[in-house]
Amino acid sequence: MRTLWRFIAGFFKWTWRLLNFVREMVLNLFFIFLVLVGVGIWMQVSGGDSKETASRGALLLDISGVIVDKPDSSQRFSKLSRQLLGASSDRLQENSLFDIVNTIRQAKDDRNITGIVMDLKNFAGGDQPSMQYIGKALKEFRDSGKPVYAVGENYSQGQYYLASFANKIWLSPQGVVDLHGFATNGLYYKSLLDKLKVSTHVFRVGTYKSAVEPFIRDDMSPAAREADSRWIGELWQNYLNTVAANRQIPAEQVFPGAQGLLEGLTKTGGDTAKYALENKLVDALASSAEIEKALTKEFGWSKTDKNYRAISYYDYALKTPADTGDSIGVVFANGAIMDGEETQGNVGGDTTAAQIRDARLDPKVKAIVLRVNSPGGSVTASEVIRAELAAARAAGKPVVVSMGGMAASGGYWISTPANYIVANPSTLTGSIGIFGVITTVENSLDSIGVHTDGVSTSPLADVSITRALPPEAQLMMQLSIENGYKRFITLVADARHSTPEQIDKIAQGHVWTGQDAKANGLVDSLGDFDDAVAKAAELAKVKQWHLEYYVDEPTFFDKVMDNMSGSVRAMLPDAFQAMLPAPLASVASTVKSESDKLAAFNDPQNRYAFCLTCANMR
């Protein structure tokens, strides 16, 4: 018996030692990881990640991930993220549109940069106005006499759009230029909510305000289908026209439709690369070795890199413009508009208003450019931003809005105080309408034997997700939504020198492209960010200026924690999706995207000016 007790005691003793060893090892590894991340970030902050070209060569435009107006603060340490998690982790990588454009423009005047090579295999896309803006910079580079080349084993639709701005496009002999058109799709939950016995109460104004349809339908309404088909067709035609002009071929040759594409592939025996070459989508078919040889002849050989001489976009040092005294403040509204402080990928009403206020109070800032790339969101937060922008204009500082890929619904609400609005022809804007959704689960609880009861001094004191929504509360909510809509169209009417009745005819939640918005008087001119800045300078009557970007600078500790937590947040869904078959992984990604949108809905009055179809555009 004593031997047995010794064995049991020994077993627990050694088990405890093993657990203690594992605990200490995990803590030590965590500490080492923390130190490495901190050192890596310190090196990047101190400029260790940038280097000048020591000799003449190409700028390698090897964009990895997506293009956004304003990357999340932790994304500025992208090199460290790529080193820790691999370049394929494009989920983690956000690239500043303006950094890319400024880099290309700096390279144009850099004697050590003799050309650009676009290697876009890890490029995950961006909205059409953003890529047009990059294309403009690439054209300026070409016009300076320096060549632009595009290389790729395959080209997705977004990758090919950028590649079309090149002097020459190479494609692998086994590659494909994958053109298929645009789509906007979303998930619809009505049947699911019915099965769960969830009661959905929808309040809206606007025939075309389709953001609530997922809660009350299992498919698109005819009105939403008609409206979305129109603007998505316009965007696709803009895509084809741009590529056709770049390649100097007819738009019908870029994409002849599904049937025409099938006939063309039949003639080439299914050889997608041959089809691309014969239809002048690319200039040459070549292997990696052949492309390397051609680029080496153009740019020279690097003994260190054992490749043609080039410097990555991520290593090329972007110079800070000189402080000329006067400045034009640039404030970003990038993402869904939320009440409160800014979160990753979303616009915080309080954060953005504070940035506008800082620009208003800075005597060196002579004008403000609000860069909007948002499908809208919280009405309360939108009004907070709008009011602060109106205060800046009232203080005598010109306000110009530059619309990016989207400036819809709440994104248009915050644009109304501007002296001048510049939109891209492919901007999605309008969507002037308001909605609210309240779900209650009293029937769900009842079906499993859970009931709610109590007393209250009025029906309004007993509003809860676990009880049926009182009729009085429903009527009050609808009145609030209708009042918000009247407020919206009145703001637009005052800003556009029109009447609420006239604005109502083009509102009702209707989405417009920038081109149509110009025709309807919702914007002042068509152009890009450069045009908006030039207009701001003109209104402020300044001859020399520099741009002052208003972004929240995180502390060093925040940078360390953001990289760590951001990496973990990104790796977990990636790891989960990696274990799923491809079709299920795609569904999981869609579900996560939908849940992220719902998480951004935090308006205290449950009122939203949000364009769901704009956010679903791809």
UniProtKB/Swiss-Prot annotation:
Signal peptide: none
UniProt main location, coarse: membrane
Phenotype upon changing E252Q: In strain: ECOR 38, ECOR 39, ECOR 40, ECOR 50, ECOR 65 and ECOR 68
Deletion consequences: No effect on processing of liberated signal peptides in vivo.
UniProt entry tagged with the keyword Membrane: yes
Periplasmic side: 46-618
Keyword Protease: yes
Membrane topology: Single-pass membrane protein
EC assignment: 3.4.21.-
Membrane-traversing stretches: 25-45
GO BP: signal peptide processing
Subunit structure: Homotetramer.
Active site per UniProt: K209 (proton donor/acceptor), S409 (nucleophile)
Superkingdom of origin: Bacteria
Recorded GO MF terms: endopeptidase activity; serine-type peptidase activity
Protein's UniProt name: Protease 4
Catalytic class of the enzyme: hydrolase
InterPro entries: ClpP/crotonase-like_dom_sf, Pept_S49_pIV, Pept_S49_SppA, Peptidase_S49, S49_SppA_1, S49_SppA_67K_type_N
Localization per record: Cell inner membrane
Cellular component terms (Gene Ontology): membrane; plasma membrane
Organismal lineage: Bacteria, Pseudomonadati, Pseudomonadota, Gammaproteobacteria, Enterobacterales
Organism of provenance: Escherichia coli (strain K12)
UniProt comment concerning the protein's domains: A tandem duplication in the protein fold creates an intact active site between the repeated domains of each monomer.
Family per record: Belongs to the peptidase S49 family.
